[in-house]
Each structure stands twice: as structure tokens, then as C-alpha cells.
Amino acid sequence: MGELLIDFQSEGNGSLKETDRFVKKAGGAPANVCVQAKKLGCDAVYLTKVGADGFGDFLVATLESEGVDVSHIGRSADLNTSLAFVSIRENGERDFSFYRTMTADLYIEPADFEDVEFSKGDVLEFGSVALATDTARDTHRYLIEKAVKAGTLICFDPNLRFN
């Protein structure tokens, strides 16, 4: 559960200031975990919200093409899909710029996931990035409490970036 965003990855090395060509990719650390779990043969369901825009369409289609259950990805007509621009500097470090103000994945609500059920064999994976708003934190708490009651394993990725 959590952030699902477009990563615009630079085609060459250099800072974002120096880069002028990007390739659109599906991104978000928890989404990457979900896809890899599916490739390992696990059932995979993603819980989030994206904008009712072309970027959201691309992300849902990408996860669906990987076999991920997208039935719990909500769509918002009022909020955009999150975007990130990333390049690789000459020293190998990544250079990020995020566009996540008033984006759909930061405004998930418990009501979006009332029908989600967990069981003992499940894993609920989430990261710190999606905890940036009170609404998202409350929703994560709601889902974590449901998962813990069901005996689900909770996995936290402290993938915090300050930019």
C-alpha cells in the first residue's frame, strides 16, 4: 500500500539541471515490492489512489500487466497522480525532484478500503513516503490495525526523502 507514481528517469547521467530527456516509468517503492512478489509467485494486491488522468491510467495498466490485482486502486477526479523526476549524477548518486502536493495517493481514506480483508498468510508492505498527510497516516493506521488483528505480517520500508 502507498505511493504509486510516475518516475521520469533521465536517459543519461548528470544532475536534473543538466538533463533534458526523460523516460516515463511506473514507480513507488511499495509498488515495486508488489510487482516483485507477484514475479515470485505470490498473489499481489495494491492499495492506493491515483489521479483520474493519463498518468494514473498508465500506472494501473502497468501493474495490471504485471499480474497485480488493481481492484483496490481508487481514482480521484480532483487530485493528480504523483510525479518524480530522477537522474543519476556522475558520482552514481540519484538526484530526485518530487511533485506530490495535493496528489491522490496522499489522500487515501479508510472508507476507500473498508472491504479489504487480511489473513494470516498475507504481508502488508508500506513505506514512510506515503505517511506525509494526516489522512494517509490515519488510513495506514486503519489498515495496519485490520492486518494485525488478522495475524498479517507488517513490513515497513523507511524510504524517506527530504526533497
What are these regions (language model features)?
Residues 1-69:
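Glycine-rich phosphate/adenosyl-contacting loop at the front of the ribokinase-like
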